[in-house]
Amino acid sequence: MRLFAVIRSRGASWQNDRTLEEQKEWDAHAIFMNRLQDAGVVVLGGPLEGTPEVLLVMRANSPAEVVQCLQPDPWTGLDLLRIARVTPWTLRLGTLPVAAN
């Protein structure tokens, strides 16, 4: 598996007057993302402060697999988050947890 840097951006349904946790279906989105983390697919993730974007570091075999993994996210279907970019990433400094099997 390879590492990918994934940028997700706010979609048309994002409500700027609400916090992250106040967006529609927050609990379902959080559960979904936590499951990806527990499975070792999402290694790191969080909002990029001062931007409408989120950075994820994900393990996958291809960019298409990244898209497939994120498709069931409730926030994808609600157009709260969209994938803006999927780029192969090489870790040069530091270490990440070993992938789950």
How should each PLM-predicted stretch be described?
Residues M1-N101:
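Conserved, structured core segments of small domains
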